Every structure is written in C-alpha cells, then in structure tokens.
Amino acid sequence: MAKHLFTSESVSEGHPDKIADQISDAVLDAILEQDPKARVACETYVKTGMVLVGGEITTSAWVDIEEITRNTVREIGYVHSDMGFDANSCAVLSAIGKQSPDINQGVDRADPLEQGAGDQGLMFGYATNETDVLMPAPITYAHRLVQRQAEVRKNGTLPWLRPDAKSQVTFQYDDGKIVGIDAVVLSTQHSEEIDQKSLQEAVMEEIIKPILPAEWLTSATTFFINPTGRFVIGGPMGDCGLTGRKIIVDTYGGMARHGGGAFSGKDPSKVDRSAAYAARYVAKNIVAAGLADRCEIQVSYAIGVAEPTSIMVETFGTEKVPSEQLTLLVREFFDLRPYGLIQMLDLLHPIYKETAAYGHFGREHFPWEKTDKAQLLRDAAGLK
C-alpha cells in the first residue's frame, strides 16, 4: 500500500446535532429505567429558543419530557441567553405517538429468542489494532480533542469557551502504518472578550498538545484553529440540530462502511443500533484475539425475522486464519439474533445517553467493548 492520508472529524456535546442525540437518548434512558421492554424511537429537533421531541414510544413508564430536555441542555452548558440557547427558558414541544401495531406483531414473540428484527437493514462493525482501544486513530484523536475542549471549558481552565466545537485530524499512513499527523482543525465557539491570537495560543497549549502524541507532530503538520477568525454564534442559534445526523462521527470516522441507520433515541429492539454494537463486539474480539489486524463485520436482517439474513467477515488481507473459518467462528460464538445479542451485551439498561457524544465505540466501559471472547476465539482457531 502506498503512502496516503486519511481524515476523520468529531463534534462536541454542544454541537446542535449532538444536543439532539443526547436529548433523544436521555429520554430513552429514563424510559428503560422504568420499563426495560419499552419500544422507543425518539427524535429531537433543536433551533434557537426551542426543542421539539417526537417519535413513537410504547411503554408503561411515565417520564417528564420537558424536565429531561432541560436537564440535558443544562448539563451540556447552554444556560445563558447570550449563548442563543438557554435550558431555563427554551420552549420544549412534544409530539410523541405509539409504535405501529404492524411492527409490534413482527417483533414480539412468545419465545423471546425468536424475537424478530424491528426492521430490515444492514449494519457494520469494525476494529483495527492501530490504537489501544482497537479503533482507527483519526476518529479516536478527533474525539479526544473535543472531549478535552469540553473538559477545559467545564473546569474553568478556559472560561471563555462555549459548548459548540468541531475537530478534524488528518493522519499520514505508509504501507498501512501511521507515520504522522498532516493536519489538525479545531474550531470552538467562544465568548466575545477573547481575541483570536490568545484563543489560538490557548487552544494549542491546553487542548491540542495534551492530546496529540508529540511523535506524530512535525514541522510540516498544519494547524487550523478557528480558521474563520470568529465563532461567537454557535449551537442551535447557528444551526438547527437533528437526531441521527452524525452517523460517521458516531462510528468509525469513515474508516469503515456504514449501513445508514442512526443510533440515538432507539431502544435495543431496533437492530440499527443493537446489531451495530454487536458487530463492533465481534470485530473487536477477532482483532483482540490476534486473528486479524483489521476486521469489518456486516450483518443484515429482515423485519420480523430472528436469524440474520447474512453475516460477512472482511479482514483486508490481514487474517491469520482462513476467512471461511472466521465466519464459522462468528456463528459459533456470537448469537446475532435480536434477542440473543440484547442478552449477550446486556442492553436493556439506561446506558445510552453517554454514547450520544464522543463516539459509540472505543470507550472501554460500554459492554460491546469487552474482549471477553478473544481467548475462546484464539483457542478455537488453533492459534498458540
């Protein structure tokens, strides 16, 4: 493989689309806490001074949509009208109905293991050994930059920062291996009083340098810090936000394929979400077992049918055992039926709001990040 560049981006928790994702998942968590069998498809729209929460929810639980919304916006940091969005005064509108009975009859079963998929679709999972969390480096470090932005904003290190921010990192590869970072973009919302020179110096010293490994930065690395020169108007005042519009940020930063389905606001019966988590779990365990350096899993479903319609394993020529054997191992050690994967990953808990910013993958405390099957796979493959 020749030398090449690869770029991924991330956005902060204060980005309008991420506000929407977090509200949708906060509603989901509140419902699952009371009713683990609830059916939830919650969508959120945010714009200056307003939040609209809609979707289809079937549950025995009662939750206060307005309170959940305000608390979520408050935690993100939009608490003053001079930011163009204020948790205390924004309008909160609700337009929620029930899940179609036509879908229910295809999902619910007397035998839970025969629970059908909530929709047709295809999902991908991916892992690579180029980082400690078995994720692609570009998206991993893009996430870490905006996480650091939120950290120094909230702890008062840089009090003039505001919640909306974006990052982008371009890595240099040579024969598939990282050799450096070519370019870094970081744009952060800020208050009026900070001048651009001071902002750029502070962002470099407090955000970029503590996060990006020095050995990957060279005199040729280009830094773009607030390249428009001003970013005071941001958040929902700058752009409207919608649930499910950051699906590449949520996954692998473009390094792997994507089936098209968003995650946030969906309960685990929706395979768009749960099967994508399971596919990551499978791919990560294959790489952790040393059966491949890179692994991409595709799984697909028909609505109302329990068994996947297909399972594909792609290892990009890095496999240590034949690909056909890998597929057999996946079928043997992982139950990818909707109920099976819910049980395998213990998904019927309020764990989703935290996934809604800084990526659904690569953070070790999520259950789909476990590598508990790596040794089983290695032994079954006959590797010493």
Swiss-Prot record:
Source domain of life: Bacteria
Names of required cofactors: Mg(2+); K(+)
Keyword Hydrolase: no
Reaction equation(s) it catalyzes: L-methionine + ATP + H2O = S-adenosyl-L-methionine + phosphate + diphosphate
Signal sequence, renumbered to the chain: none
EC number(s) from the headed UniProt entry: 2.5.1.6
Localization, UniProt: Cytoplasm
GO molecular function (one): ATP binding
Residues bound to ATP: 15, 164-166, 230-231, 239, 245-246, 262, 266
Cofactor note: Binds 2 divalent ions per subunit. Binds 1 potassium ion per subunit.
Residues holding Mg(2+): 17
GO cellular component annotations of the record: cytoplasm
Pfam families named among the record's database cross-references: S-AdoMet_synt_C (PF02773), S-AdoMet_synt_M (PF02772), S-AdoMet_synt_N (PF00438)
Start and end residues of each stretch annotated as Flexible loop: 99-109
Function: Catalyzes the formation of S-adenosylmethionine (AdoMet) from methionine and ATP. The overall synthetic reaction is composed of two sequential steps, AdoMet formation and the subsequent tripolyphosphate hydrolysis which occurs prior to release of AdoMet from the enzyme.
HAMAP family the record matches: S_AdoMet_synth1
Quaternary structure and partners: Homotetramer; dimer of dimers.
Protein name: S-adenosylmethionine synthase
Organism: Shigella boydii serotype 18 (strain CDC 3083-94 / BS512)
Gene behind the chain: metK
